[in-house]
Amino acid sequence: MNLHEYQGKQLFAEYGLPVSKGFAVDTPEAAAEACDKIGGSEWVVKAQVHAGGRGKAGGVKLVRSKEDAKAFAAQWLGKRLVTYQTDANGQPVTKILVESCTDIAKELYLGAVVDRSSRRIVFMASTEGGVDIEKVAHETPEKIIKATIDPLVGAQPFQGRELAFQLGLEGKQVAQFAKIFVGLAKLFKEHDLALLEVNPLVIKADGDLHCLDAKINIDANAMYRQPKLKTFHDPSQDDPREAHAASFELNYVALEGNIGCMVNGAGLAMGTMDIVNLHGGKPANFLDVGGGATKERVTEAFKIILSDSNVAAVLVNIFGGIVRCDMIAEGIIGAVKEVGVKVPVVVRLEGNNAELGAKVLAESGLNIIAATSLTDAAQQVVKAAEGK
Protein backbone atom coordinates (compact mmCIF):
# COMPACT_ATOMS: atom_id res chain seq x y z
CA MET A 1 0.00 0.00 0.00
CA ASN A 2 1.37 3.40 -0.98
CA LEU A 3 1.15 6.53 1.13
CA HIS A 4 0.80 10.11 -0.05
CA GLU A 5 3.70 12.48 0.51
CA TYR A 6 1.89 14.34 3.29
CA GLN A 7 1.18 11.06 5.09
CA GLY A 8 4.80 9.99 4.80
CA LYS A 9 5.97 13.30 6.20
CA GLN A 10 3.53 12.92 9.08
CA LEU A 11 5.30 9.67 9.98
CA PHE A 12 8.71 11.32 9.52
CA ALA A 13 7.72 14.05 11.98
CA GLU A 14 6.62 11.46 14.54
CA TYR A 15 10.16 10.04 14.42
CA GLY A 16 11.76 13.44 14.89
CA LEU A 17 12.96 13.84 11.31
CA PRO A 18 13.25 17.32 9.76
CA VAL A 19 10.34 18.06 7.42
CA SER A 20 8.72 21.23 6.12
CA LYS A 21 5.76 22.72 7.96
CA GLY A 22 2.72 21.99 5.86
CA PHE A 23 -0.96 21.17 5.64
CA ALA A 24 -2.91 18.82 3.37
CA VAL A 25 -6.08 20.57 2.17
CA ASP A 26 -9.07 19.62 0.06
CA THR A 27 -10.54 23.03 -0.86
CA PRO A 28 -9.07 26.17 -2.48
CA GLU A 29 -10.08 28.23 0.57
CA ALA A 30 -8.21 25.84 2.87
CA ALA A 31 -5.11 26.25 0.70
CA ALA A 32 -5.17 30.01 1.29
CA GLU A 33 -5.70 29.47 5.02
CA ALA A 34 -2.75 27.08 5.11
CA CYS A 35 -0.49 29.83 3.78
CA ASP A 36 -1.53 32.03 6.73
CA LYS A 37 -0.88 29.22 9.21
CA ILE A 38 2.57 28.52 7.79
CA GLY A 39 3.59 32.16 7.48
CA GLY A 40 6.20 33.65 5.18
CA SER A 41 5.86 34.98 1.66
CA GLU A 42 6.56 31.88 -0.46
CA TRP A 43 5.04 28.42 -0.38
CA VAL A 44 5.18 25.20 -2.36
CA VAL A 45 1.90 23.60 -3.42
CA LYS A 46 1.85 19.95 -4.47
CA ALA A 47 -0.90 17.78 -5.93
CA GLN A 48 -1.08 14.54 -3.93
CA VAL A 49 -1.16 11.41 -6.09
CA HIS A 50 0.51 8.00 -5.90
CA ALA A 51 2.90 8.70 -8.76
CA GLY A 52 6.21 10.37 -9.44
CA GLY A 53 6.93 13.01 -12.05
CA ARG A 54 4.44 15.49 -10.59
CA GLY A 55 6.70 18.50 -11.10
CA LYS A 56 7.12 18.01 -14.85
CA ALA A 57 3.36 17.46 -15.18
CA GLY A 58 2.54 20.77 -13.49
CA GLY A 59 1.52 19.20 -10.19
CA VAL A 60 4.11 21.09 -8.10
CA LYS A 61 4.44 24.87 -8.04
CA LEU A 62 6.14 27.64 -6.11
CA VAL A 63 3.61 30.36 -5.24
CA ARG A 64 4.16 33.83 -3.81
CA SER A 65 0.61 34.72 -2.80
CA LYS A 66 -2.37 33.12 -1.11
CA GLU A 67 -4.39 33.82 -4.25
CA ASP A 68 -1.96 31.76 -6.34
CA ALA A 69 -2.17 28.89 -3.83
CA LYS A 70 -5.95 29.06 -3.98
CA ALA A 71 -5.89 29.12 -7.79
CA PHE A 72 -3.56 26.08 -7.91
CA ALA A 73 -5.89 24.12 -5.63
CA ALA A 74 -8.90 25.12 -7.74
CA GLN A 75 -7.01 24.03 -10.85
CA TRP A 76 -6.20 20.52 -9.60
CA LEU A 77 -8.71 19.40 -6.96
CA GLY A 78 -11.20 17.02 -8.55
CA LYS A 79 -9.03 16.72 -11.66
CA ARG A 80 -6.68 13.94 -12.79
CA LEU A 81 -2.90 14.36 -12.97
CA VAL A 82 -1.11 12.52 -15.77
CA THR A 83 2.61 11.83 -15.29
CA TYR A 84 5.10 9.44 -16.88
CA GLN A 85 4.30 6.98 -14.06
CA THR A 86 0.51 6.94 -14.63
CA ASP A 87 -1.58 5.65 -17.49
CA ALA A 88 -3.25 7.99 -19.96
CA ASN A 89 -6.13 8.60 -17.54
CA GLY A 90 -3.87 9.80 -14.74
CA GLN A 91 -4.59 9.76 -11.01
CA PRO A 92 -7.34 11.76 -9.25
CA VAL A 93 -6.26 14.68 -7.07
CA THR A 94 -8.22 14.90 -3.80
CA LYS A 95 -5.60 16.63 -1.63
CA ILE A 96 -3.13 19.48 -2.07
CA LEU A 97 -0.09 19.76 0.20
CA VAL A 98 0.78 23.36 1.04
CA GLU A 99 4.14 23.73 2.76
CA SER A 100 6.87 26.21 3.54
CA CYS A 101 9.52 27.00 0.95
CA THR A 102 13.04 25.58 1.40
CA ASP A 103 16.27 27.17 0.16
CA ILE A 104 18.18 24.26 -1.40
CA ALA A 105 21.97 24.19 -1.68
CA LYS A 106 22.38 20.53 -2.70
CA GLU A 107 20.18 17.48 -3.32
CA LEU A 108 20.96 13.95 -2.08
CA TYR A 109 19.14 10.62 -2.18
CA LEU A 110 18.41 8.26 0.71
CA GLY A 111 16.21 5.19 0.48
CA ALA A 112 15.67 1.69 1.84
CA VAL A 113 14.26 -1.58 0.53
CA VAL A 114 14.08 -5.20 1.61
CA ASP A 115 16.89 -6.96 -0.25
CA ARG A 116 15.71 -10.48 -1.01
CA SER A 117 19.20 -11.86 -1.69
CA SER A 118 20.58 -10.87 1.72
CA ARG A 119 17.13 -11.04 3.40
CA ARG A 120 17.86 -7.77 5.15
CA ILE A 121 16.92 -4.12 4.95
CA VAL A 122 19.40 -2.28 2.74
CA PHE A 123 19.84 1.50 2.72
CA MET A 124 21.02 3.25 -0.42
CA ALA A 125 22.42 6.76 -0.58
CA SER A 126 23.68 8.89 -3.44
CA THR A 127 24.87 12.39 -4.25
CA GLU A 128 22.53 12.22 -7.26
CA GLY A 129 19.35 13.41 -5.54
CA GLY A 130 16.20 14.62 -7.23
CA VAL A 131 16.34 12.08 -10.08
CA ASP A 132 15.09 8.49 -10.41
CA ILE A 133 17.42 6.18 -8.51
CA GLU A 134 16.77 3.52 -11.17
CA LYS A 135 18.35 5.84 -13.74
CA VAL A 136 21.37 6.41 -11.49
CA ALA A 137 21.72 2.65 -10.90
CA HIS A 138 21.67 2.03 -14.65
CA GLU A 139 23.93 4.85 -15.83
CA THR A 140 26.28 5.50 -12.89
CA PRO A 141 25.97 2.62 -10.38
CA GLU A 142 29.21 3.65 -8.70
CA LYS A 143 27.41 6.70 -7.33
CA ILE A 144 25.16 4.55 -5.13
CA ILE A 145 26.50 3.54 -1.72
CA LYS A 146 24.83 0.97 0.50
CA ALA A 147 24.49 -0.06 4.13
CA THR A 148 22.99 -3.39 5.20
CA ILE A 149 21.05 -3.48 8.46
CA ASP A 150 21.65 -6.38 10.86
CA PRO A 151 18.16 -7.47 11.99
CA LEU A 152 19.42 -8.39 15.48
CA VAL A 153 20.93 -5.02 16.41
CA GLY A 154 19.19 -2.67 13.96
CA ALA A 155 20.67 0.38 12.26
CA GLN A 156 23.67 1.82 14.08
CA PRO A 157 24.79 5.47 14.16
CA PHE A 158 28.26 4.52 12.91
CA GLN A 159 26.68 3.19 9.69
CA GLY A 160 24.99 6.54 9.20
CA ARG A 161 28.27 8.36 9.78
CA GLU A 162 30.04 6.12 7.25
CA LEU A 163 27.41 6.93 4.63
CA ALA A 164 27.62 10.63 5.49
CA PHE A 165 31.39 10.71 4.98
CA GLN A 166 31.05 8.89 1.65
CA LEU A 167 28.46 11.48 0.57
CA GLY A 168 30.95 14.25 1.34
CA LEU A 169 29.06 15.62 4.33
CA GLU A 170 30.98 17.38 7.06
CA GLY A 171 30.63 19.00 10.47
CA LYS A 172 27.12 19.03 11.93
CA GLN A 173 25.75 17.39 8.79
CA VAL A 174 27.33 14.04 9.74
CA ALA A 175 25.45 13.84 13.03
CA GLN A 176 22.24 15.06 11.38
CA PHE A 177 22.51 12.41 8.67
CA ALA A 178 23.17 9.66 11.23
CA LYS A 179 20.06 10.70 13.17
CA ILE A 180 17.93 10.68 10.00
CA PHE A 181 19.38 7.30 8.99
CA VAL A 182 18.63 5.65 12.35
CA GLY A 183 15.16 7.23 12.49
CA LEU A 184 14.23 6.02 9.02
CA ALA A 185 15.48 2.51 9.81
CA LYS A 186 13.34 2.42 12.95
CA LEU A 187 10.33 3.68 10.98
CA PHE A 188 10.94 1.08 8.28
CA LYS A 189 11.00 -1.82 10.74
CA GLU A 190 8.20 -0.72 13.08
CA HIS A 191 5.75 -0.01 10.27
CA ASP A 192 6.52 -3.06 8.10
CA LEU A 193 7.60 -1.03 5.08
CA ALA A 194 8.58 -2.51 1.74
CA LEU A 195 10.13 0.69 0.38
CA LEU A 196 11.10 4.09 1.73
CA GLU A 197 12.62 7.01 -0.18
CA VAL A 198 13.66 10.55 0.64
CA ASN A 199 14.29 12.03 -2.77
CA PRO A 200 15.60 14.54 -2.39
CA LEU A 201 17.19 14.73 1.01
CA VAL A 202 18.50 18.28 0.76
CA ILE A 203 21.23 20.38 2.27
CA LYS A 204 19.62 23.76 2.93
CA ALA A 205 21.30 27.10 2.42
CA ASP A 206 22.13 27.19 6.15
CA GLY A 207 23.85 23.78 5.90
CA ASP A 208 21.20 21.72 7.71
CA LEU A 209 19.76 18.50 6.26
CA HIS A 210 16.05 18.39 5.43
CA CYS A 211 13.64 15.69 4.17
CA LEU A 212 12.01 17.43 1.22
CA ASP A 213 10.00 14.47 -0.02
CA ALA A 214 8.63 11.19 1.36
CA LYS A 215 7.78 8.05 -0.56
CA ILE A 216 6.53 5.07 1.45
CA ASN A 217 5.20 1.68 0.44
CA ILE A 218 3.89 -0.69 3.13
CA ASP A 219 4.07 -4.47 2.84
CA ALA A 220 0.47 -5.47 2.08
CA ASN A 221 0.98 -8.81 3.84
CA ALA A 222 1.67 -6.98 7.11
CA MET A 223 -1.31 -4.62 7.06
CA TYR A 224 -3.18 -6.76 9.58
CA ARG A 225 -0.80 -5.55 12.27
CA GLN A 226 -0.73 -1.91 11.16
CA PRO A 227 -4.25 -0.66 12.02
CA LYS A 228 -3.14 2.98 12.06
CA LEU A 229 -1.71 2.77 8.56
CA LYS A 230 -4.90 1.14 7.28
CA THR A 231 -6.64 4.46 7.92
CA PHE A 232 -4.14 6.12 5.54
CA HIS A 233 -5.44 4.11 2.58
CA ASP A 234 -6.77 6.31 -0.23
CA PRO A 235 -9.09 4.17 -2.38
CA SER A 236 -9.30 6.92 -5.01
CA GLN A 237 -5.74 6.02 -6.05
CA ASP A 238 -6.52 2.34 -6.62
CA ASP A 239 -7.27 0.85 -10.02
CA PRO A 240 -11.02 -0.01 -9.78
CA ARG A 241 -10.39 -3.43 -11.32
CA GLU A 242 -7.62 -4.22 -8.85
CA ALA A 243 -9.81 -3.14 -5.93
CA HIS A 244 -12.71 -5.27 -7.21
CA ALA A 245 -10.38 -8.25 -7.64
CA ALA A 246 -9.06 -7.89 -4.10
CA SER A 247 -12.61 -8.13 -2.73
CA PHE A 248 -12.76 -11.65 -4.23
CA GLU A 249 -9.23 -12.52 -3.05
CA LEU A 250 -7.93 -12.34 -6.62
CA ASN A 251 -4.50 -10.88 -7.27
CA TYR A 252 -4.89 -8.65 -10.34
CA VAL A 253 -2.56 -6.12 -11.90
CA ALA A 254 -3.60 -4.25 -15.05
CA LEU A 255 -1.07 -4.08 -17.90
CA GLU A 256 -1.15 -2.60 -21.39
CA GLY A 257 -1.41 -5.63 -23.70
CA ASN A 258 -4.39 -7.33 -25.36
CA ILE A 259 -4.17 -10.92 -24.07
CA GLY A 260 -6.03 -11.54 -20.83
CA CYS A 261 -4.39 -14.08 -18.52
CA MET A 262 -6.08 -16.16 -15.80
CA VAL A 263 -3.74 -18.46 -13.89
CA ASN A 264 -3.63 -20.21 -10.53
CA GLY A 265 -0.40 -19.46 -8.69
CA ALA A 266 1.74 -16.33 -8.86
CA GLY A 267 4.82 -18.13 -10.19
CA LEU A 268 2.87 -19.87 -12.94
CA ALA A 269 1.19 -16.55 -13.76
CA MET A 270 4.58 -14.87 -14.21
CA GLY A 271 5.79 -17.77 -16.36
CA THR A 272 2.63 -17.60 -18.45
CA MET A 273 3.15 -13.89 -19.09
CA ASP A 274 6.76 -14.57 -20.06
CA ILE A 275 5.88 -17.26 -22.60
CA VAL A 276 3.12 -15.10 -24.10
CA ASN A 277 5.74 -12.37 -24.58
CA LEU A 278 8.17 -14.92 -26.00
CA HIS A 279 5.70 -15.81 -28.75
CA GLY A 280 5.01 -12.19 -29.68
CA GLY A 281 1.98 -11.44 -27.53
CA LYS A 282 1.42 -8.75 -24.90
CA PRO A 283 -0.35 -9.66 -21.64
CA ALA A 284 -3.22 -7.37 -20.65
CA ASN A 285 -2.94 -8.31 -17.01
CA PHE A 286 -1.49 -10.44 -14.25
CA LEU A 287 -4.27 -12.42 -12.55
CA ASP A 288 -3.74 -15.15 -9.96
CA VAL A 289 -6.99 -16.86 -8.94
CA GLY A 290 -5.17 -18.73 -6.18
CA GLY A 291 -5.14 -22.38 -5.19
CA GLY A 292 -8.78 -22.46 -4.10
CA ALA A 293 -10.31 -21.43 -7.41
CA THR A 294 -14.10 -21.77 -7.48
CA LYS A 295 -16.72 -21.16 -10.17
CA GLU A 296 -17.60 -17.85 -8.51
CA ARG A 297 -13.99 -16.65 -8.49
CA VAL A 298 -13.40 -17.80 -12.06
CA THR A 299 -16.55 -15.93 -13.12
CA GLU A 300 -15.40 -12.74 -11.39
CA ALA A 301 -11.95 -13.18 -12.92
CA PHE A 302 -13.50 -13.28 -16.40
CA LYS A 303 -15.57 -10.18 -15.63
CA ILE A 304 -12.50 -8.28 -14.47
CA ILE A 305 -10.36 -9.35 -17.43
CA LEU A 306 -13.08 -8.46 -19.94
CA SER A 307 -13.72 -5.07 -18.34
CA ASP A 308 -10.54 -4.08 -20.20
CA SER A 309 -11.72 -3.14 -23.70
CA ASN A 310 -8.24 -3.88 -25.10
CA VAL A 311 -8.53 -7.62 -24.42
CA ALA A 312 -8.77 -9.52 -27.72
CA ALA A 313 -8.28 -13.06 -26.36
CA VAL A 314 -8.05 -14.82 -22.99
CA LEU A 315 -5.58 -17.49 -21.90
CA VAL A 316 -6.59 -19.69 -18.95
CA ASN A 317 -3.65 -21.70 -17.59
CA ILE A 318 -4.49 -23.98 -14.67
CA PHE A 319 -2.34 -26.54 -12.89
CA GLY A 320 -4.52 -28.88 -10.87
CA GLY A 321 -3.00 -29.71 -7.53
CA ILE A 322 -5.40 -29.22 -4.67
CA VAL A 323 -8.07 -28.08 -7.11
CA ARG A 324 -9.37 -30.55 -9.73
CA CYS A 325 -9.13 -29.58 -13.40
CA ASP A 326 -12.63 -30.92 -14.18
CA MET A 327 -14.06 -28.59 -11.53
CA ILE A 328 -12.13 -25.68 -13.04
CA ALA A 329 -13.41 -26.66 -16.49
CA GLU A 330 -16.99 -26.54 -15.22
CA GLY A 331 -16.26 -23.15 -13.68
CA ILE A 332 -14.86 -21.86 -16.97
CA ILE A 333 -17.91 -23.09 -18.89
CA GLY A 334 -20.28 -21.53 -16.37
CA ALA A 335 -18.35 -18.27 -16.42
CA VAL A 336 -18.25 -18.11 -20.23
CA LYS A 337 -22.02 -18.64 -20.35
CA GLU A 338 -22.80 -16.16 -17.57
CA VAL A 339 -20.45 -13.41 -18.69
CA GLY A 340 -21.14 -13.86 -22.39
CA VAL A 341 -17.51 -13.98 -23.45
CA LYS A 342 -17.21 -12.78 -27.05
CA VAL A 343 -13.43 -13.14 -27.47
CA PRO A 344 -11.51 -16.39 -28.09
CA VAL A 345 -10.67 -18.35 -24.93
CA VAL A 346 -7.65 -20.69 -24.90
CA VAL A 347 -7.47 -23.15 -22.00
CA ARG A 348 -4.52 -25.23 -20.87
CA LEU A 349 -5.18 -27.71 -18.06
CA GLU A 350 -2.50 -29.84 -16.43
CA GLY A 351 -2.41 -32.02 -13.32
CA ASN A 352 -5.25 -33.43 -11.22
CA ASN A 353 -8.05 -34.72 -13.54
CA ALA A 354 -6.62 -32.78 -16.51
CA GLU A 355 -7.93 -35.29 -19.09
CA LEU A 356 -11.41 -35.20 -17.61
CA GLY A 357 -11.26 -31.40 -17.60
CA ALA A 358 -10.31 -31.34 -21.28
CA LYS A 359 -13.21 -33.71 -22.05
CA VAL A 360 -15.67 -31.47 -20.19
CA LEU A 361 -14.49 -28.46 -22.23
CA ALA A 362 -14.66 -30.38 -25.52
CA GLU A 363 -18.25 -31.47 -24.85
CA SER A 364 -19.42 -28.00 -23.80
CA GLY A 365 -20.17 -26.85 -27.34
CA LEU A 366 -18.61 -23.48 -26.57
CA ASN A 367 -15.90 -21.70 -28.54
CA ILE A 368 -13.13 -22.74 -26.18
CA ILE A 369 -9.76 -23.70 -27.65
CA ALA A 370 -8.05 -26.55 -25.77
CA ALA A 371 -4.24 -26.38 -25.70
CA THR A 372 -1.99 -29.42 -25.37
CA SER A 373 0.92 -27.63 -23.70
CA LEU A 374 1.92 -24.22 -22.38
CA THR A 375 3.81 -23.47 -25.58
CA ASP A 376 0.80 -24.49 -27.65
CA ALA A 377 -1.44 -22.34 -25.44
CA ALA A 378 0.76 -19.28 -25.92
CA GLN A 379 0.94 -19.76 -29.69
CA GLN A 380 -2.82 -20.31 -29.96
CA VAL A 381 -3.78 -17.26 -27.89
CA VAL A 382 -1.36 -14.99 -29.78
CA LYS A 383 -2.90 -16.12 -33.08
CA ALA A 384 -6.40 -15.66 -31.70
CA ALA A 385 -5.61 -12.15 -30.48
CA GLU A 386 -4.31 -11.28 -33.94
CA GLY A 387 -7.52 -12.61 -35.51
CA LYS A 388 -5.78 -15.49 -37.28
UniProtKB/Swiss-Prot annotation:
A single GO molecular function term of this UniProt record: magnesium ion binding
Record note on cofactor: Binds 1 Mg(2+) ion per subunit.
GO CC terms, sorted: cytosol; succinate-CoA ligase complex
Signal peptide: none
Pfam family, any one: Ligase_CoA
Residues the record lists as binding ATP: 46, 53-55, 99, 102, 107
Assembly and interaction partners: Heterotetramer of two alpha and two beta subunits.
Protein name as annotated: Succinate--CoA ligase [ADP-forming] subunit beta
Organism ancestry: Bacteria, Pseudomonadati, Pseudomonadota, Gammaproteobacteria, Pseudomonadales
